[in-house]
Amino acid sequence: MDPLRRDFLKTSAAVALTSQIFTGNVRGANDRLSAAFIGMGKMGRSNLGYAMRQENLLVSAVCDIFDRNLNTAVQMTQKQPGGPAKGIRDFREILADKSIDVVCIATPDHWHPYMTVEACKAGKDVYVEKPVCVVVDEGVKMVQAARKYKRVVQAGTMQRSAVHFAKAAEIVRSGELGKVTFVRCWNYGLSEPEGIGNPPDQEPPPGLDWDMWLGPAPQRPFNSNRFGVDPADRYFSRFRWFWDYAGGMMTDWGVHWLDIVQWAFDEGMPTGISAFGEKFYVKDNRETPDTLQVTYEYPGFLAVYENREGNAQSMFDKSGGILFNGSKGTMYLDRGGYKIVPEKGSALEASEMKSTSGGNREHWANFLDCVKTREKPTSDIEKCQHSTTTCLLGNVALRSKLRLDFDAQKWTVNQPEAKKYLSREYRNPWKLVV
């Protein structure tokens, strides 16, 4: 049998297993896992929906510091066997509840590290959304906590659970595209010139605990864009565009694409990073750039991530994706599938594969199965820590205006002026301690 075919069958079989609804008996014939969900915005409710389709899972609690989100999440659980989930405003109640087995953390990014570490210390297994952290040091501690407390921690980079992404990564690893020396990832769009607007600071809305929302982040007056929740629920929260809480498109979408790139190249990390970008187009109060280009030097190839909000024209008429450029051919890959275009004179045949699933449901099934088996999940925290760090380094290069040399053994850069961006000080009383 062709080696690529054999390896793909192994990979596909592993991914396909996760597409089955989780039916493992974790603690007894009729005993279900008890789950709690922290952060019930659009992403949290999406995870809640996929998790509730799994068997042997009872959603015991949902948690949010904004009444509207909390009430909506409780309502979603009304018809589940076992009755509706309890609505909780303080996540520490969930961590103290010994009856809860697993937690899903889908808060704004700046809360991910603290909640994940504390959940591991409390004996919970964790499904945490991507990007898993806001600075490099936090990701290192998250991995340390998972290993120290022997917890299963799955990150929300669900593309790894989609069959066509697994097949595409195997194609790159197999050499079918020849020597791949250049990879391009992008997200292009055309925003309105006013962007997200310039709302003034004001009092927080009723039903929101703004101080708790900020948590370990610096004290700031309430601003509707920093909070970012759309009253009409039309878009994901705009906190993503402020450095205190996130890393802009570089970490929000870049982590999806670069996670697949690093998967295809056996989880390797970049050694050199340079970046250029600015707010050239939109006139709003966001802090992250609307135009960005980051170049990563890996052993043997270069990868580029690009984002722009002032022009939507792109390769293959796609707003985002990955191009793997090899000596025998090029592969375009996104959530819709992949397409291979041979180089002139190459024996490589043109081919394509359509997506059959986005991977969300399979990702949850894989997580719950690993809770049972105690094996590492498809997107183990260490893999997403690597991918998130790669994205964060792009922002560090941008903000420091330096070309970075990265040491993956020590998780640091060789440029002293840039090291201040690798960690952050937590606001009292929060401390990130493994």
For the regions a language model picked out, list residue spans one by one.
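N-terminal secretory signal peptides and thylakoid transit peptides that target proteins
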Residues: 1-16
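N-terminal Rossmann-like dinucleotide-binding module
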Residues: 12-80, 159-162, 261
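Residues forming the Rossmann-fold NAD(P)(H) cofactor-binding site
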Residues: 45, 113, 255
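Conserved SAM-binding strand-loop segment of SAM-dependent methyltransferases
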Residues: 85-90
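Alpha-helix C-terminal capping/helix-to-coil transition sites in glycosyltransferase folds
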Residues: 97-99
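N-terminal Rossmann-like NAD(P) cofactor-binding module of classical short-chain dehydrogenase/reductase
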Residues: 103-104
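Beta-strand-loop-alpha-helix segment that lines the small-molecule cofactor/substrate pocket
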Residues: 108-109, 113-161, 175
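Contiguous beta-strand/loop segments that form the cofactor/metal-binding neighborhood of enzyme cores
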Residues: 166-167, 179-382, 388-434
